[in-house]
Curated annotation (Swiss-Prot):
It holds the Pfam family tRNA-synt_2b. PANTHER family: SERINE--TRNA LIGASE, SERYL-TRNA SYNTHETASE. This is Serine--tRNA ligase. It comes from Staphylococcus aureus (strain bovine RF122 / ET3-1). Its EC number is 6.1.1.11. Belongs to the class-II aminoacyl-tRNA synthetase family. Type-1 seryl-tRNA synthetase subfamily. Consists of two distinct domains, a catalytic core and a N-terminal extension that is involved in tRNA binding. Gene3D superfamilies: Bira Bifunctional Protein, Domain 2, Serine-tRNA synthetase, tRNA binding domain.
Length: 428
């Protein structure tokens, strides 16, 4: 959520930033109008409360002097009713303002390129060279079924479209990837490992920005009023919700693996085959809590942490800056990492790393103190995929496939695969 002071002090800046996302800047005028009404109500209410205190003194004086106090008692009752009415009006305006503010996205960093869609994202780095095959490469969805690594048909029977059973060495590869990623982030990148709740309440979803605007993208357990998480970013970031982080704790770096659940509303017809766009998938997440002056360097470091996984696995990728029309709701700046997939003859997103600045912290009330005597300040929060496991799985299978139908295991994964160096079709 944005600071109301930005609307008061820099309305034109806020309007231009909102317009860059393709949203209606008139919302700024709505907020300012409500804010003015609110301030007038507060002044009127304070004046009434001051008068009520004065009347209370007059009543006491009249009682001491045994004078008739009917008139001041009547005024006291009227003031009480009027104050109650003003408080009700103030509460209504507060709710209206919050309802509007919570749907306004974060302000975009000045260095984010302008554009309308992912076609306008800007490449800033490329690593590795896509492999030139001496045979016709297969798509990962064909390879995994031939090698008995996955079963999409039975998953559809059990759960519907966009689900998968990972079987045999497919399940082993998924588990190996998660273990490898978590191990690298904790032992080399300085993150603390967390196992997170995968059902969370509405306040938690609100804190990271999924609610109220994106409820259609979520799965909800109606009876309990809980939501399945779309990413471990949600419970990891909310770890410090409604807390003041004590001096010396920041920077705080968490990583965790979880299943992620997404309805994929609006993605009908896109990536309908394979592991690229499922309703349930595994992902290793990185979340950081930083002091404001450190968050931009932290974004670069976090993105490098994700890139290190791809480089050690030998997977060609590129880094792009998301443009103003493609960046997420809570982010001020986002880098996407896109891995090369031969079946698409293109790069596909495998990680998003974002600096949300104080946007999520204001919603979730996450503050920190620089020292014991300091006033609490809003922390900056960052999140990044490190990586999407299913997409990494698909990239390995496609980029490391062999003409005889086998798949070579990247060297970095061999210890996590029990020493296995190749995946072949099971004998039985």
């Amino acid at each position: 959520m944005l600071d109301i002071r930005l609307f008061r002090n820099e309305p034109d800046t806020v309007k231009s930033k909102i317009e860059l996302r393709g949203d209606d800047p008139k919302v700024v005028d709505e907020i300012l109008e409500l804010d003015e009404q609110r301030r007038k109500l507060i002044i009127a209410t304070e004046e009434m409360k001051a008068r009520r205190n004065k009347v209370s003194e007059e009543i006491a004086l009249k009682k001491r002097n045994k004078e008739n106090d009917d008139d001041v008692i009547a005024e006291m009752r009227t003031l009480g009713d009027d104050i109650k009415e003003k408080d009700s009006q103030l509460n209504e305006i507060d709710n209206k303002m919050t309802g509007i503010l919570c749907r306004i996205p974060n302000l975009i960093s000045d260095d984010v390129p302008q554009g309308e869609s992912d076609e306008d994202n800007v490449e800033v780095k490329k690593w590795g060279t896509p492999r030139e095959f001496s045979f016709e490469p297969k798509a990962h969805w064909d390879i995994v079924e031939e090698l008995k690594m996955a079963d999409f048909d039975r998953a559809a029977k059990v759960s519907g479209a966009r689900f998968v059973y990972l079987t045999n060495e497919g399940a082993q590869l998924e588990r190996a990837l998660m273990n490898y990623m978590i191990t690298k982030h904790t032992t080399q990148h300085g993150y603390t490992e967390m196992m997170v709740p995968q059902l969370v309440n509405a306040d938690t979803m609100y804190g990271t920005g999924q609610l109220p605007k994106f409820e259609e993208d979520l799965f909800k357990v109606e009876k309990e009023g809980l939501y399945t998480i779309p990413t471990a970013e949600v419970p990891l970031t909310n770890f410090y919700r409604n807390e003041i982080i004590q001096p010396g704790v920041l920077p705080e770096k968490f990583t965790g693996q979880s299943a992620c659940f997404r309805s994929e509303a609006g993605s009908a017809g896109r990536d309908t085959r394979g592991l690229i766009r499922l309703h349930q998938f595994d992902k290793v997440e990185m979340v950081r809590f930083e002091q404001p002056e450190d968050s931009w360097n932290a974004l670069e470091e976090m993105t490098t942490n994700a890139e290190a996984i791809l480089e050690e696995l030998g997977l060609p990728y590129r880094r792009v800056i998301l443009c103003t029309g493609d960046i997420g709701f809570s982010a001020s700046k986002t880098y996407d990492l896109e891995v090369w997939l031969p079946s698409y003859n293109d790069y596909k997103e495998i990680s998003s790393c974002s600096n949300c600045m104080d946007f999520q912290a204001r919603r979730a009330n996450i503050r920190f103190k620089r020292d014991k005597a300091a006033k609490p300040e809003l922390a900056h929060t960052l999140n990044g995929s490190g990586l999407a496991v299913g997409r990494t799985f698909a990239a390995i299978v496609e980029n490391y496939q062999n003409e005889d139908g086998t798949v070579t295991i990247p060297e970095a994964l061999v210890p996590f695969m029990g020493g296995k160096t190749q995946i072949s079709k099971p004998v039985k």
